[in-house]
């Protein structure tokens, strides 16, 4: 229920999403529900961040597609990043990130609608939004590259 302040203005509280993981002595990772993932030493935190960025981008797209009755029927893709010392503060961080996704949508929206849906997917992926260096995206939709 929204709270009403003394000045009569209604303050809405943003929805909160909470996540937790556990790290086992063997390096395995588990979610709060107990689902486990055994990761080899070649999986660095940076790789996991990129995997999260790709999954988040697709989940965001799927959300916006669902609102207009369109299905994401298949998807493949990847991401890359450059980590180095930032000029602004001298700390090592992601200074460049790019995402490339190829998706199949049914039914296929009009070109203007596709551009809007892709923009919303990029904007609303909280992993990408959390990065100081905003990711660049390259989308292929139903076999055609979509420049943004």
At which residue positions do the language-model features occur?
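Extended beta-strand/beta-hairpin segments
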Residues: 1-52, 58-148
């Amino acid at each position: 229920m929204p709270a009403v302040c003394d000045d009569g203005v209604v303050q809405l509280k943003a929805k909160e999403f909470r996540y937790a993981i556990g790290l086992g002595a063997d390096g395995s990772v588990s979610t709060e529900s107990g689902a486990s993932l055994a990761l080899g030493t070649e999986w660095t935190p940076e790789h996991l961040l990129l995997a999260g960025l790709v999954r988040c981008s697709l989940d965001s797209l799927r959300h916006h597609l669902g609102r207009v009755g369109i299905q994401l029927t298949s998807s493949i893709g990847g991401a890359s990043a450059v980590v180095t010392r930032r000029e602004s503060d001298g700390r090592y961080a992601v200074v460049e990130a790019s995402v490339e996704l190829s998706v199949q949508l049914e039914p296929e929206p009009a070109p203007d609608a596709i551009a809007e849906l892709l923009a919303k997917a990029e904007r609303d992926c909280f992993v990408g939004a959390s990065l100081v260096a905003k990711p660049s995206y390259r989308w292929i939709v139903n076999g055609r590259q979509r420049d943004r």
